[in-house]
Amino acid sequence: MAAKDVKFGNDARVKMLAGVNVLADAVKVTLGPKGRNVILDKSFGAPTITKDGVSVAREIELEDKFENMGAQMVKEVASKANDAAGDGTTTATVLAQAIVNEGLKAVAAGMNPMDLKRGIDKAVAAVVSELKALSKPCETSKEIEQVGTISANSDSIVGQLIAQAMEKVGKEGVITVEDGTGLEDELDVVEGMQFDRGYLSPYFINKPETATVEMDNPYILLVDKKISNIRELLPVLEAVAKAGKPLLIIAEDVEGEALATLVVNTMRGIVKVAAVKAPGFGDRRKAMLQDIAILTAGTVISEEIGMELEKAALEDLGQAKRVVINKDNTTIIDGVGDEAQIKGRVAQIRQQIEESTSDYDKEKLQERVAKLAGGVAVIKVGAATEVEMKEKKDRVEDALHATRAAVEEGIVAGGGVALIRAASKAAANLQGDNEEQNVGIKLALRAMEAPLRQIVANAGEEASVVASAVKNGEGNYGYNAGTEEYGDMIAMGILDPTKVTRSALQFAASIAGLMITTEAMVTELPKDDKLDPSAAMGGMGGMGGMM
């Protein structure tokens, strides 16, 4: 086991604080409408330019191991805020730095760290409940656009695109961000349920100009097995032919004689059929077939529940207004499923999302919710260079997370104002169990001014003057650093999602409290692997006369 280096008390805290400040100082220059960029060197390819706090934090590793421990703990604050709300990483870092700096000053003055931490925790709990009281629901498209614009660093086009996307696919719909091909940002919307399986034979195509299969008011047969024997399908095919409607077959696979017969019947015009493979694999495929069944008011023909394909009747088939199939995707538009059943299924999947521990599973479950709830929107980010594209994509993803958070928990006044208002309301009723807890409460409430001060400092104004003016105001009165004006922040469209502000404060206080109560730090001593240069050159003494 390697030897360890141990530091105690003030020595440890000084080192830790130095690390905290290096990381936080690099991150906080990005805060606010006039925040600057940070350039990150990459071991390969062009450097990355970003205004995303968590991207900056993730890049920082310090040479001094004790300082690095401090930096890594603040990095954890940014990462946690990013995971919880998808935004607010810079705010969380600024708050953590302020609480740690104030807290360690109090510890150095002889205060009890545990009581300070208890005071900080009390202050944060009170401020969080005040934030919830200040919060108002984010319902209109205009508010969603404003939240998106602020989070994308005042890029109004991004805000508009996100608002349009949410309007089209609903607040539950999936919105993804992809690289565009031109200079302009674009929005593509896929309505209905789309899954990544195309037609099993190009002979099903009935729209040669677009190489697609299009069906109006089709029946949809859902089968949880491979179909290779046409005899199993004949009763359903005859019933559908009599009804005079097209048929879409979604099965594990359709092959051999069965596929050949379907193709021949389609080409002769006897019955209009198309077949696609069911999406997903294993249990996920079964779940997705069930989703499609609920969406189209059909039944999955599965031998597991004693159903046989030969005995399937028209009432077992699902229906939709329209189906479009190309070589890669199938889209079912306007399934006739019962609204209450669809909502019940969505609620069931949401419960699974809550219980799931895997990010991959959560993402797949979220996709299923979106497909049931209304559609998928793709924002294609346009830029002149790849470096700009990466930077812009980061901002769009941040804005998207922020708008989702706003829809979930509502919005508060932005620009650091909500924290100041919540802190002043909380201060009126807060009392610690002893004087040292009161000091903890006061330092936490004082630290909550830090985001506003940093936004103002980044805009080149005097932070103390603006902070004093905002504190003396009421309600949503604050300072718009973009236009350098005072006024009603919500009326000016400067909004923050409540969830982002709340998460930033809670994670910052949690990690800062742990750092304030640190009394010793342990790290490995560096290994001394370097050779002694004089020993390495010892055998070359006879070369002296050659110079």
From Swiss-Prot:
Gene Ontology biological process: protein refolding
Subcellular location: Cytoplasm
EC assignment: 5.6.1.7
EC class of the enzyme, as a word: isomerase
Catalytic reaction annotation: ATP + H2O + a folded polypeptide = ADP + phosphate + an unfolded polypeptide
Xref: CDD domains: GroEL
Pfam families xref list: Cpn60_TCP1
Main location as per UniProt: cytoplasm
Family statement: Belongs to the chaperonin (HSP60) family.
Subunit composition and interactions: Forms a cylinder of 14 subunits composed of two heptameric rings stacked back-to-back. Interacts with the co-chaperonin GroES.
Protein name: Chaperonin GroEL
Source organism (scientific name): Actinobacillus succinogenes (strain ATCC 55618 / DSM 22257 / CCUG 43843 / 130Z)
Organism phylogeny: Bacteria, Pseudomonadati, Pseudomonadota, Gammaproteobacteria, Pasteurellales
Gene coding for it: groEL
